[in-house]
């Protein structure tokens, strides 16, 4: 699985549709966060930028998948390639729509929000203030942002005000 993902990450792409089909056949075999997170699209950010519409369309169904690592795949690919101003609103909307309760999905969403914050702090902070995420994921995103060395002390203090109470499980 890992090797397959690594091979796909280095694949010489001559046909976008064929390549995305190969990736789609691999995605169901993802069984851990490490296999998921090691993958990147062949050609990296430059390739994705050249095929942004196709790649975004390819990822969209995975955001609403039922399987943990299919959702995590969409979120991790999103944070790698779409956590930027030009795609911020649709990416954050996809993150807010995720209702899957698995730890690895929730952590990926928190990580993605933190990554969005580093690239677009004002817009992401305003989005966080809308409380669109479940409380645990919302607070974990704030924690991850505050742990970053790229965020100044004043912003870290402001973010504390956005934390929400989380119900303890019985």
Give residue ranges: language-model regions.
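Alpha-helical scaffold domains
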Residues: 1-170
């Amino acid at each position: 699985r890992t090797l397959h993902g690594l091979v796909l990450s280095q694949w010489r792409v001559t046909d976008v549709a064929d390549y995305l089909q190969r990736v789609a056949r691999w995605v169901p075999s993802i069984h851990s966060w490490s296999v998921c997170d090691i993958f990147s699209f062949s050609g990296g950010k430059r390739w994705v930028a050249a095929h942004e519409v196709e790649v975004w369309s390819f990822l969209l169904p995975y955001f609403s998948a039922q399987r943990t690592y299919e959702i995590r795949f969409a979120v991790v690919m999103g944070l790698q390639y779409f956590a930027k101003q030009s795609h911020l609103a649709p990416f954050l909307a996809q993150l807010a729509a995720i209702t899957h309760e698995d730890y690895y999905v929730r952590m990926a969403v928190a990580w993605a929000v933190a990554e969005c914050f580093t690239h677009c702090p004002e817009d992401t902070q305003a989005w966080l203030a809308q409380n669109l995420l479940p409380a645990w994921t919302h607070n974990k995103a704030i924690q991850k942002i505050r742990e970053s060395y790229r965020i100044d002390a004043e912003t870290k203090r402001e973010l504390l005000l956005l934390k929400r109470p989380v119900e303890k499980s019985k």
